């Protein structure tokens, strides 16, 4: 059968399955691919449980994560779905942003109700900015007592509300295993779940619709034309003759105008999110710009030196530190394209952080960095990655 062409016509949405180990995240992922394949055979491939469970290793910011990616389509949307089988993999994925989610399906076994990892996953989803969560109450075939199902549903709603997620989110009773076996009643439950995903997870804001930002990777001079900065456009669109600001690393912000946009040595009218471009800047000297700064739409990005972050510290086996660190630890924080040294303050009551831990820290950088909440970073010691994190709150 011919492969269905990737149509740009449908909105593309990134989702994932989260929840306690053994509650059926991977089985549900497999069931979704099978049910959608049977419903729309020309749009979807079916993926067996073991294809998803033996998730390939990926490296993100120097950290190895096991994570499975599957794709599928409904009538309305094209989905990229991630499933991190292990608890540690889930935590690492959320913090490093190996796979960002526009929404998540929280899988809770009706037989157990919310468990410690269920809570931890929802908390982490809040901290890393997952916009929406809905619920698959799995293994519902194994619970005959309607009151018990309602009780579990209530507990899950309280858990969502506690982390400021929508407590009226859809909670769909499913049996992933029975759906995989082709049981008509439970196949219908997975179809109902996917309808709920279509309806409840909001369309993501496309990167091109956000204000322009490009991290500077390189700076050079073209004789007779001026200074060019190169990098990959992170978000937004830049047109020739638009004003920009150069932000970060230095104490003051520089204003200038983009007089040319080049890509693959060709002149363009504009560059957009995802493009690797060179920007010609009017009246800017070679020494006025450096790697680590960002070129951005005026007034949309500010430099900061103090922030709070959620971090994952690599274990010794992952190539991380062999020893814990304490208050006033001074590593480098790698933001986008450059390292900046910072001083770490641990949360009250935390004496030290062990390799393999995830925790909140406060950081004071020695140079300002253009940042927003949600920006990701690596923690390095002399170029070696020892951790990864995400800005959860800007202090100054």
Curated annotation (Swiss-Prot):
Assigned keywords, A-Z: Cytoplasm, Elongation factor, GTP-binding, Hydrolase, Magnesium, Metal-binding, Nucleotide-binding, Protein biosynthesis
Highest taxon above the source species: Bacteria
Protein known as: Elongation factor Tu
Keyword Lipoprotein: no
Stretches for region G5: 175-177
Region annotated G1, chain positions: 19-26
Biological classification of the source: Bacteria, Bacillati, Actinomycetota, Actinomycetes, Mycobacteriales
Stretch list, region G2: 62-66
């Amino acid at each position: 059968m011919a492969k269905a062409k990737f149509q740009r016509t449908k909105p593309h949405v990134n989702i994932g399955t989260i929840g306690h180990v053994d509650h059926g995240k991977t089985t549900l992922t497999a069931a979704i691919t099978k049910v959608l394949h049977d419903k729309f055979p020309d749009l979807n491939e079916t993926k067996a449980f073991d294809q998803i469970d033996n998730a390939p290793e990926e490296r993100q910011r120097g950290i190895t994560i096991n994570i499975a990616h599957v794709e599928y389509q409904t009538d309305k949307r094209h989905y990229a779905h991630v499933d991190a089988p292990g608890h540690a993999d889930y935590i690492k994925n959320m913090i490093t942003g190996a796979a960002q989610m526009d929404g998540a399906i929280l899988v809770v076994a009706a037989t157990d109700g919310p468990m410690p990892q269920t809570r931890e996953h929802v908390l982490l989803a809040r901290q890393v900015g997952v916009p929406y969560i809905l619920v698959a109450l799995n293994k519902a075939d194994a619970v005959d007592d309607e009151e018990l199902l309602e009780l579990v549903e209530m507990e899950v709603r309280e858990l969502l509300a506690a982390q400021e997620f929508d407590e009226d989110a859809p909670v769909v009773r499913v049996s992933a295993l029975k759906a995989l076996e082709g049981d008509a009643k439970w196949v219908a439950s997975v179809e109902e779940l996917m309808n709920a995903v279509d309806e409840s997870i909001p369309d993501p804001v496309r990167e091109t619709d956000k204000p322009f930002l490009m991290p500077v990777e390189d700076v050079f001079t073209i004789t007779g034309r001026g200074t060019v900065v190169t990098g990959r456009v992170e978000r937004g669109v830049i047109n020739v003759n638009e004003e920009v600001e150069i932000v970060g690393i230095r104490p003051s912000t520089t204003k200038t105008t983009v007089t040319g946009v080049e890509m693959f040595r060709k002149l363009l009218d504009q560059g957009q999110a995802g493009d690797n471009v060179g920007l010609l800047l009017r009246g800017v000297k070679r020494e006025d710009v450096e790697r680590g700064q960002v070129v951005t739409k005026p007034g949309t990005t500010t430099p900061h030196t103090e922030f709070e972050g959620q971090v994952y510290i690599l274990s010794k086996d992952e190539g991380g530190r062999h020893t814990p660190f304490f208050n006033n630890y001074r590593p480098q924080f790698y933001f986008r394209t450059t390292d900046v040294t910072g001083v770490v303050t641990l949360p009250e009551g935390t004496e030290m952080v062990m390799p393999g831990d995830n925790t909140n820290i406060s950081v004071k950088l020695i140079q300002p960095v253009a940042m927003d909440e949600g920006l990701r970073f690596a923690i390095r010691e002399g170029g070696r990655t020892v951790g990864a994190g995400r800005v959860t709150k800007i202090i100054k």
